[in-house]
Amino acid sequence: MDSKWAALLLLLLLLLNWGHTEEAGSWGEDQVFAGEDKGPHPPQYAHIPDRIQTPGSLFRVLLQAMDTPRRSPAFLFQPQRFGRSAWGSWSKEQLNPQARQFWSLAAPQRFGKK
């Protein structure tokens, strides 16, 4: 599965779940899980403002994650690095005499209507 499709599926599930929690009512202080403490947020999250937890900000973060560049598309079209004449460019002197005659006669072909 492509990472973009996975991110969109995650976003869709997140938004659907968000809608269900809004209908059922928000969690109150008496509905906290047994394993959670009721104290303030840990200091590691103190610098994060509360607006980051909105659905719009979650959507924005997912879109930014999808748009991060992984590799340049030019990476796929690199010249051959190993093999014959890998360190230099082609020249007509490197070709044998028969190939030189062939390339001198080569002309662009016309396809389609004449």
Curated annotation (Swiss-Prot):
It comes from the Eukaryota. Keywords: Amidation, Cleavage on pair of basic residues, Neuropeptide, Secreted, Signal. It comes from Mus musculus. The gene is Npff. This is Pro-FMRFamide-related neuropeptide FF. GO terms for molecular function: G protein-coupled receptor binding; neuropeptide hormone activity. Belongs to the FARP (FMRFamide related peptide) family. It is found in: Secreted. Morphine modulating peptides. Have wide-ranging physiologic effects, including the modulation of morphine-induced analgesia, elevation of arterial blood pressure, and increased somatostatin secretion from the pancreas. Neuropeptide FF potentiates and sensitizes ASIC1 and ASIC3 channels. GO terms for cellular component: axon terminus; dendrite; extracellular space; neuronal dense core vesicle; perikaryon; postsynapse. The modification Phenylalanine amide is found at residues 82, 111. One of its GO terms (biological process) is neuropeptide signaling pathway.
